[in-house]
Structure formats: C-alpha cells, structure tokens
C-alpha cells in the first residue's frame, strides 16, 4: 500500500517541529513543508532580544541546515499558497504548481494585530514578527533617539528593554492599568513596572493615542492630552492569526483555526498548531496559548494524532522573558491575586508561588531558572506545601 503524503504549511517553530516530530514518531512517507519565508525555519524569541543587541546577530535555526535533506523532508521556501485544496486534496501555489496531500498541518502563525492609526505612518511605524522586522528595527534604534512603544505586554516590554540598552529614550503607552496584565501575576507586574522605571523607561498606564501627525518627528497626542514627539514608533497589542487560507477552505475559525485537544480541525485530515490555532476546550470555551513551548507541544501532539499514536501528556504551560539582565520564567496557572514570594525581588532573585488550598498550581522565577525543573514536577503531580516552608530561604527547595 502506498504511504500517505503529509504537507506542512508554515515556516516557524510549530511547522519545523511538526516535521521533526513526524520523523521521530516513525513516519516514513512523503513529507513537504511550504513557507513564504526564504529563510530556513528560525527561532522567533531572539528577535526582540539578541537580534537587536548582539554586534553580529545570526538567526538561530530551529533545526540544523542539514537535517532537512538527511530526513528526506522537501522544503519549498519563498512560495505563496493560493488554496489548500480541502475538497481536492491538492494544495495549489500561486505559480500554478499543485501538490497532493493526504493529511495537512497548518502552522502559518500570526501577524501583529493592526493599529490603523499608526499603520498610516507606513515605514515609520514598526511591529515585530519576522527576521526582517528585527533587521529594520536594529537600523533605527540608535542612541538618543526617542522611541514610543504602544503596548506593555511581553513583546512591548522586551522591546523597551532592548531599546533602552541601545541607549534610546523610551516611552511605553499602555491602555490597561498595569504591565503584562494578560500573562503575569500582580506581584510580577509590579516588579517589572519598577524595573523599567528604574532603567529610565517612562511608562504611561491607562492611556492611549488619540491623534497622530507625521512630520520631521511623529507627533502623538494621548487621551490624557499630553503630546509626545517620537523618532521611532513601535506597537505590539496582540496578534491576528494568519487564518485566511483556512477561512477560504471553510474550516472553523475564530481569530485562529479552531482545533480540538488533538490539534484536529473540523476536517479530520487537517490539523493546526502554534499561534494560528485556537483550542476549543471540553467546556466549549476557546483558548489560545502564544508561546514557543506551545508550538513545540502542539507539533508533537498533531504528529501523534496524524499517525494514530497515543497523544503525549501536556506539561504545565511555560514561557520565559528576558528583560535587561533578568530572566523570568512563568509556569502553570498565572491567575489569582494571592501569591507568595521566596527571596527578595530587590536583589533580582526571587520566586513567586501560586498555591490553591495548599496545592502548587503556578510559579514565576526571577533569575532562578535552575528551580524550574522541580517546580514543573510539583505542579504536574499536584504536590501540596506548607506556605511557610515554601518561602523559607533557609530550607532548600529540593528538600521539600
């Protein structure tokens, strides 16, 4: 019997790891990856950090360059897909080529959620999703330039830190009442706000841009009535899933391709993962997880599901952020206001713990990354703790 053909659409983390996972899990059939980028699949997290800060930055490839040929994966880079061919099982490119598939994995990622008021500035306005975006930013983030960043989420704060380290004068505008309000607990939000302010970043909370005038400098009028002058304007206010191909194929979408917990779409032969995907939970709610690890996890899950293998167990959600000299790692459930702190954040070494009825459900480490491994095991096992012992620095965590 002829082996099936699997096509992967996308060129990022989830796409590359899906190819790797399929081969690792025993798939020996024909495997193709189609991407509109000309680079080999590369790591996205460094774009806001090392790609802006290192003297001679290089893209970090997800897989070694020789891996693709050695594992008989056909790479089609710099191509544009016209249609997925859901009914015909023939993917069609804009150049007229068509490629048969038996199963499809979509990992087309996401674009920056648009902000029309700033998009009208054209090339004077910047977002960060791809290597080319980082290269453009690197050129304009020069010492003493005034930089305005709209959005104080993870990407906004990482860019603020990098721009400050490049000796720019940075102002951050945030509509919400706090920084990283969507994915950090209150004590970590307070720490990060203070950390940036101490570094010289001006952070304007509960504020937004009302009017923009493009001149020698960009003039930004805020809701508060204040006017800012900027050499460089950057924004990061969320994502817009690259779901157009899926919509045109009549797959279920909701600012993301709707998948189940096996990464399967409404078509049993089509799977999706990474930032383009949004999971429908058992209770009907839709949940998106935008992280490097989630892309890896969903690639492994989709590969197993495509091959009819048992699905791997999901670890607790985890992501990290590097800002200035700080490494913060977030694991588990970030909800809730009652967090315990081990250590002193003022010394830039601390761990915040989230206990629910004594059970550890989440944690954030500040420059204590070596502790993530035991914490992950505790969260997975539902381990209970005495709060006083957990925050006592005289007691080694590994002894608890």
Curated annotation (Swiss-Prot):
Function: Part of the multicomponent 3-phenylpropionate dioxygenase, that converts 3-phenylpropionic acid (PP) and cinnamic acid (CI) into 3-phenylpropionate-dihydrodiol (PP-dihydrodiol) and cinnamic acid-dihydrodiol (CI-dihydrodiol), respectively.
Superkingdom, natural source: Bacteria
Metabolic or biological pathway: Aromatic compound metabolism; 3-phenylpropanoate degradation
GO molecular function, one term: ferredoxin-NAD+ reductase activity
Source organism: Escherichia coli (strain 55989 / EAEC)
Subunit-level organization: This dioxygenase system consists of four proteins: the two subunits of the hydroxylase component (HcaE and HcaF), a ferredoxin (HcaC) and a ferredoxin reductase (HcaD).
Keywords, sorted A to Z: Aromatic hydrocarbons catabolism, FAD, Flavoprotein, NAD, Oxidoreductase
InterPro entries, A to Z: FAD-oxidoreductase/Apoptosis, FAD/NAD-bd_sf, FAD/NAD-binding_dom, FAD/NAD-linked_Rdtase_dimer_sf, HcaD, Reductase_C, Ring-hydroxylating_dioxygenase
Binding sites annotated in the UniProt record for NAD(+): 146-174
Family classification: Belongs to the bacterial ring-hydroxylating dioxygenase ferredoxin reductase family.
Cofactors (names): FAD
Record's keyword annotation contains Ribonucleoprotein: no
PANTHER family, per database record: APOPTOSIS-INDUCING FACTOR 1, RIESKE DOMAIN-CONTAINING PROTEIN-RELATED
Record-level GO BP terms: 3-phenylpropionate catabolic process
Binding-site residues for FAD, renumbered to this chain: 5-36
Enzyme Commission numbers on file: 1.18.1.3
Protein name from the UniProt record: 3-phenylpropionate/cinnamic acid dioxygenase ferredoxin--NAD(+) reductase component
A single Gene Ontology CC term: cytoplasm
Catalytic activity: 2 reduced [2Fe-2S]-[ferredoxin] + NAD(+) + H(+) = 2 oxidized [2Fe-2S]-[ferredoxin] + NADH
One Pfam entry name: Pyr_redox_2
Keyword Ligase found: no
């Amino acid at each position: 019997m002829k082996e099936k053909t699997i096509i992967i659409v996308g060129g990022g983390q989830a796409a590359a790891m899906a190819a790797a996972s399929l081969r690792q899990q025993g798939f020996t059939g024909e495997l193709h990856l189609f991407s509109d980028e000309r680079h080999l699949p590369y790591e996205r997290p460094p774009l806001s950090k090392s790609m802006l800060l290192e003297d001679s930055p290089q893209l970090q490839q997800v897989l070694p360059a020789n891996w693709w040929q050695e594992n008989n994966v056909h790479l089609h880079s710099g191509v544009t897909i016209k249609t997925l061919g859901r009914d015909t099982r023939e993917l069609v490119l804009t150049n007229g080529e068509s490629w048969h598939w038996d199963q499809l994995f979509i990992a087309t990622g996401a674009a920056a959620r648009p902000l029309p008021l700033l998009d009208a500035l054209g090339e004077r306005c910047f977002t960060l999703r791809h290597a080319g975006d980082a290269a453009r930013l690197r050129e304009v983030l020069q010492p003493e330039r005034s930089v305005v960043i709209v959005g104080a989420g993870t990407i906004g704060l990482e860019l603020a830190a990098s721009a400050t380290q490049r000796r720019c004068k940075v102002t951050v505008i945030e509509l919400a009442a706090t920084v990283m309000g969507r994915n950090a607990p209150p004590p970590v939000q307070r720490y990060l706000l203070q950390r940036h302010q101490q570094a010289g970043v001006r952070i304007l909370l509960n504020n937004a841009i009302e009017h923009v005038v493009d001149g020698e400098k960009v003039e930004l009028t805020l809701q508060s009535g204040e006017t800012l002058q900027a050499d460089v304007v950057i924004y990061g206010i969320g994502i817009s899933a690259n779901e157009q191909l899926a919509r045109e194929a009549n797959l279920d979408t909701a600012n993301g391709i709707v998948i189940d917990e096996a990464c399967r779409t409404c078509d049993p032969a089509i799977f999706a993962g990474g930032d383009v995907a949004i999971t429908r939970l058992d209770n009907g709610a839709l949940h998106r997880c935008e992280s490097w690890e989630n892309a890896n996890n969903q690639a492994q899950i989709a590969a197993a599901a495509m091959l009819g293998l048992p699905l791997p167990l999901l670890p607790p959600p985890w992501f990290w952020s590097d800002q200035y000299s700080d490494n913060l790692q977030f694991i588990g459930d970030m909800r809730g206001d009652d967090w315990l702190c081990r250590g002193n954040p003022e010394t830039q070494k601390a761990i915040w713990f989230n206990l629910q009825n004594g059970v550890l459900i989440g944690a954030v480490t500040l420059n204590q990354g070596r502790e993530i491994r035991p914490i992950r095991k505790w969260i997975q096992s539902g381990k209970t703790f005495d709060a006083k012992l957990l925050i006592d620095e005289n007691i080694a965590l590994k002894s608890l």
